[in-house]
C-alpha cells in the first residue's frame, strides 16, 4: 500500500521546527567547520501566494543546504519577506484595508506554503522589510550615503566631513559649475586663467553656496529630473513599469514631467561595478547584461557651434527664472558624445532631445508652436516606448542650424523622440550613412546621406539595389548615393570623403580625428556610460520614510541616528493625492517638526521597493542586533554569500543596486568584502501546462485529449489532416494557467513535488509544467518505501526488508558509484541527473529479497537532501533516534568505483544477435568462447563454419560465418 506521506510530512516538519534542526551556528560555536551561506532572492509576498514555479529555486538551495550540512558545513540558509511596494498599496486601496494588515496575512500564507514543502530555513533569522526594526537600518544606510561623497582620486566613498575639511584647508577649490577639483596653485590662484579667476575658494562662498556645493557631491542628493508621472497611481514609475504610455499596474495614463526627486550617485561607481564583474562566478550572459546596462563607451565630446537664428529668441523661461536677450545666444554651442568621431564628415544634421534646455533658446518664434506641440506629444511617452526599434521615426526642425567643426558645413538642428535627455548629452550628431536610426530619419525627412566609411564588397553586394554590378561600380555607387542602399553601414572600414583622415582604417581614423579636435579646441577624448543615477524616491505611503528634514528653502538635513527608525505614521487615508504631493503630506502632525526654534518638515516621499532588498543578505547574518546593522565579526565570518539563486528578471537592477550599496559600505569600512555574492545561479522559468491550437485559417484551442502525436508534432485526433501546435506560457492569473503547490502537495506529497520539480530538467532551463508527469516520482518514492520498509504497518525501530548482511559485489560497486555521482551532481546543481542515479540504484534494490543494512542506510542518506521527509521516516524506522539532517554524507570506496564486469554485443555477420556479460579483466580467448556459446548466437552459427572471430577491445564481438 502507498506510504502515508501526509502524516509523515507533517510529523517531520513539526520536528524540525521544534528542534531548530537548521539553526546556523554563530562563529564562536562553529569551530573548524567551513561556512556556507546559501541564499534565495527573498520573495515579495503577494496575495495570490506561491504557484508551482516559485519553489523551484527554493528547492534547489534547500537540497544544496541539506547536502552541505551532511558534509560538515556550518550553513546559513535564511528566509524573509520583501514586503514594501506599490502592489501592496494598490491592493490595500482597492479593498479599503491597511497595507500592513494585508502584508501580514500574505506573509503568513507564504510562510505556511514554504514550511509545507519542508524547506530547511533557519526561521530564527526571519526578516520583514516593513518591520521598523528592519527599516531602521535601511534608513541608517541611506544616511551613510547622504553623509558621503565619491573621491575621484581614491576612487571610493569618503565621509562628507573629509570633503569639507579639504575645502576649508584650500586643498580643493570650487569650479564655476559648482564642481570640486584639486587646487592646482593655492598660492597663485588668480593666475590660473590669466586675469580671470575661474575657481573659487571655500571662504569666498556664501553659506547657501557652500550648502549647494556639498549637496552636489553627496552620494544621496535631490535633483529636478524628468520622470514618468502617473496621476492615477499617484507616483513616479520606472521605465520598465510603463507600457505604451500607460502604467503596467492598472493601465493608467503616464506623462513625462520634471519633479524634485531623491537620486543616488551610482554613476560614480560605474567603473568598479564593471571591472569587478570579471572575478564573480556568475553566468556570463548575466554579467553581459550588467555590462550593457552600465554601457561604458570610449569616444569623443565634440562641440558644434550654433548659428544664431535670423530672429533671436525672446522669452522668459519660468523654470530658470531668466530672460534671454538679443545677442546672448551668439556663442552657444551643442556638445555631443560619439563613439565614432571618424564619421564626423558624414554628420549632415543634428538632433536634440525634446527636453534639451537649448531648444527654447535656439527656436525662433515661427517654429515655436510646432516645437511645443511635438514636445507635448513626446511627454506622454515613456523612454522605453520612444526607444522602440520598430516605431516610425518622428521629429521637428527647430529653425536653427549648427556648424560641423571639421568641414564648417551648415547643418540643421531637429528635435526627435529617439534622442533621450538622460543619455550622453541629450544631443547627437546624425550620420545617416552609418547609423540605422539616423538613416531612417534622414530618409523620412529627405536629409543628405553622405558615406564616410567604405564597407567591404560583401556588404555592398548584399545591401545594394543593384547587387550584380562589379566591385568598382558598387563602391562608386555607394560613394555617390549611400541613401540608395537598403540600410546604414555601421561597421568598421576605410575612411572616405574625409579629407583629414582619408584612407585610414577606422581605429586610426578615430585617433587622428580626436587629435585634430583637441588641437582645434573643438572637442576632446571622453568616456561615457549609459548608466544613470538611481531615481530613489516614490510618491506613495507604503515604503520606508526618508530620515530627512527639510527647511523652508528645501535644504535637506539628516536626522540623528538616535532618532531611527523614523516610523511610518498610522494613516487611514493613504490614497494618492493625484498631485506630486505624496500621501504622507496629509499626516501634518508627523510632517511638521520644530527643532531649536526652527520649523522643518519631514521628507514625504518614500524609498523604492529596491531599498530593503539592497542589503537584506547582511541583516540575515545578525537579524536581532539593536546596536548595529550587522556585527562586524559575524559579517566577516559569513560574507560573501557563497550561493545566490533567483530569477533572471533581477539580473540587472536588484543585483546592480545591491552591489552599489555594498561597495559604499565597503569603502566606509562597514563590510569586509568588495562584492556581496560570490556565485550566482538563475533558475529557469517553469511555464504553465502546454496549450494546443489548431493550425488552420481560424485557429481554435483544443484540449490535450483531442490531440494525437504524429512524428515530431501533433495532429487533431478527429481529423489527422489538421496540424496542432503546442505552446507553453508563463504562469499568470490572467491566463488561467496557475498551478498551486497546495493542490500538488495534498495529492502527492511535498517530497514528490520536490523531486518532480528537480527532475524536469536542468535547473537553469525553461520547462513546462505537466501535472500528469508527477505520478512518476510518486511511484519512485512508493517503490523506495516498499523496498526498504515493506508496508505501512512496519513498526518504528524495525523493518520488514532490511537485514544485517553484505551487499552483493555488483550492487556494492553501483552503490559506491552512486554515492560519488549524486554528491557531485548536487554540488553542481545537476539535480535531475542525481535523481536518475537514485532511481537506477532503487531499481536494482528491488531485485533483492531483502536489503543489506549498509545499502539501505546509504541510499536513505543520499535521498535525504532531495526527499527529506520520507528519508527521515525511513532513517528512524531503521533504528536511529536522531534526525539525519546532520548525519555525515556517505563515503565511497575509490577501489569499488570501477565496473567488475562489462556487457558486450555479439554480432553474427555484422548484425547483433545477443549480448554477453564478462569479467572486466577477461582475456580474449574466454570472451570468444562465451560469445560463441551465447543462446542468441547459437541459432545463427549452428551447422555453419565460423570463418573468422573478431574482438574489438571493450566494444564488441563479431563472428563471420559462411
Language model feature labels by segment:
Residues 2, 15-19, 94-333, 427-563, ...:
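Residue patterns forming the tRNA-binding/recognition surfaces of aminoacyl-tRNA synthetases
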Residues 1-33, 353-356, 365-368, 448-457, ...:
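Basic, alpha-helical terminal appendages of large translation-related enzymes
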Residues 1-39, 69-78, 102-108, 282, ...:
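Conserved oxyanion/phosphate-binding beta-strand-loop segments in alpha/beta enzyme cores
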Residues 285-335, 380-409, 413, 534, ...:
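Flexible, glycine/threonine-enriched loop-and-boundary segments that flank and lead into catalytic domains
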Residues 3, 86, 97, 101, ...:
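Long, charged, mostly alpha-helical binding arms that flank functional sites
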Residues 82, 153-159, 216, 220-228, ...:
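Helix-rich, typically C-terminal accessory recognition domains appended to large enzymatic cores
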Residues 26-103, 127-138, 338-339, 405-441, ...:
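N-terminal catalytic cores of NTP/NDP-binding nucleotidyl/phosphoryl-transfer enzymes
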Residues 61-62, 74, 356-454, 483, ...:
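Catalytic alpha/beta core of large soluble enzyme barrels
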